[in-house]
Amino acid sequence: VFGVLPLLAAGGLAFAAVKNHRIQTGNDAFIPAAWHNLRTDEIFPDLLREPSTGGQQAPGWVRQGIVKDSDCKKALMPRLASVAVENGCTTVLRATYVDAGGEAAATVALCVLGSNDQARTIERSGLSVVADHPGPMVVPVAVPKTAAAGWRTSLGHGGGTMSPTLFGPYLAAITVGPTDPDRRYGNLPGEWKSSGQPESLVYQSLSTDLLFAFSHSFDKAVDGR
């Protein structure tokens, strides 16, 4: 009887290995098609905010509208569009968000490229959201009858890119700025007035936080299938 136990254990380990391989193989096949197979509200959830690390939860950003399957050259700012096309960009999905106070807008993009290596190549080319002044990367999408109705390219002050998954052929990109088209550049809204930072740095900081939140959300959605 005792001689059977190791065989059973080994059999169990072998079965687990085969099962895990099948799961990984299925996930590997799903990842490149995730942008097409996930629902739009799974890619761009109603609310985006950084994962809680204890303490008070950030209020987050509320989705205003979604644009599906846009041409790469039309959806991205020229600086990113050219390098994205060179790296196999086939389509771009975009969604516009507004912060909880309604004072800042952001258009987030999911770019479908040729490979994950190509996405990381773009990140390393100085367009990363954590690079030195990467600037707006996505053509803003205005959403009528919302706080983002006046959102447009000239209002974009911050932005950047990030690879949202470890293996997928995706690049996340963002443009952030004020929702008020009549507000003069340099006049900070709300509690940001006392931050002591130039406006471009404030919106760049918002870009970083929101793109990290989106990347975490998208990666979780892909892994959860």
How should these model regions be labeled?
Residues 77, 119-123, 211, 215:
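Extracytoplasmic/secreted envelope proteins and their assembly/folding machinery
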Residues 1-35:
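Hydrophobic single-pass membrane-targeting/anchoring helices
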Residues 24-26, 137-225:
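Extracellularly exposed regions in secreted/surface proteins, prominently low-complexity, repeat-rich
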